[in-house]
Amino acid sequence: MNFDETVPLSQRLEWSDVVPLTQDDGPNPVVPIAYKEEFRETMDYFRAIYFSDERSPRALRLTEETLLLNSGNYTVWHFRRLVLEALNHDLFEELEFIERIAEDNSKNYQLWHHRRWVAEKLGPDVAGRELEFTRRVLSLDAKHYHAWSHRQWTLRALGGWEDELDYCHELLEADVFNNSAWNQRYYVITQSPLLGGLEAMRESEVSYTIKAILTNPANESSWRYLKALYKDDKESWISDPSVSSVCLNVLSRTDCFHGFALSTLLDLLCDGLRPTNEHKDSVRALANEEPETNLANLVCTILGRVDPVRANYWAWRKSKITVAAI
């Protein structure tokens, strides 16, 4: 902020021709907001130029001052876009302005909407910059919804798919529990025009996911991702030996949580998997003498014990099991 911006607008020669427009709260406001004087005056001058539709360099500067006081004001962002277009302003400078605002308030829908508008105007040449911008934001908050949404929009609208799978791997190497990174990985393999789609990527992704599962069987995200790799292909889901094998591998271990392996096996059984003796033996080894002859019922009973938070859910699943799911 330069020196002139610390001087009240009413004392600046540049604004001497403008009559500020006060906020109309009606004749008898019940609880008028006690705005700070700087904010009140800035908004009064903004209203004046907004209603006169002044699209000038000083109007652009005023929107900046106003947004620095309240970056969530949608009307100010909207008017700023009108002024930017009227002045044919350098939009690369605008990206820098947005980044300054984001340093203090990145969880601001209006800011991201404006960022998308600017990036769309600039086109594919800024794809790399947008991906780097979201990378910086996500390094501070790995689950930042707006950053992920903007990143997916950037890939879809501007490009930059080439290194995205590697970026997802980088995030998962740092934190395999990062469900946002798993979600992004699925977005990439299903949407990237460079990879051939889900079916083409399935074999390598199943291998990748099983490795992650065996490293940490208590990570629900990787189990969910594994099932998603067979979306709309139940036959492959129940017939691929890799899936039931990873369940058996985890169930045979004594050093980990078995809940997600059991729930995956339950899904397989309910979808039509015919259990082998190995499946039956692995499940019965975890039973506490529960008197169940139906394997799927037994899995639900064990899940109610090892996953008590969702005990009611597993009881409901048990009630829906058909005789075929043995």
UniProtKB/Swiss-Prot annotation:
Optimum pH is 7.9-8.5 for CTIL substrate and geranylgeranyl transferase activity. InterPro entries: Prenyl_trans_a. Its EC number is 2.5.1.58, 2.5.1.59. It comes from the Eukaryota. Coiled coil: none annotated. It is an enzyme of class 2 (transferase). Optimum temperature is 30-37 degrees Celsius for CTIL substrate and geranylgeranyl transferase activity. Its cofactor is Mg(2+). Keywords: Magnesium, Prenyltransferase, Repeat, Transferase. Signal peptide: none annotated. It catalyses: L-cysteinyl-[protein] + (2E,6E)-farnesyl diphosphate = S-(2E,6E)-farnesyl-L-cysteinyl-[protein] + diphosphate; geranylgeranyl diphosphate + L-cysteinyl-[protein] = S-geranylgeranyl-L-cysteinyl-[protein] + diphosphate. Essential subunit of both the farnesyltransferase and the geranylgeranyltransferase complex. Contributes to the transfer of a farnesyl or geranylgeranyl moiety from farnesyl or geranylgeranyl diphosphate to a cysteine at the fourth position from the C-terminus of several proteins having the C-terminal sequence Cys-aliphatic-aliphatic-X. Heterodimer of an alpha and a beta subunit. Belongs to the protein prenyltransferase subunit alpha family. This is Protein farnesyltransferase/geranylgeranyltransferase type-1 subunit alpha.
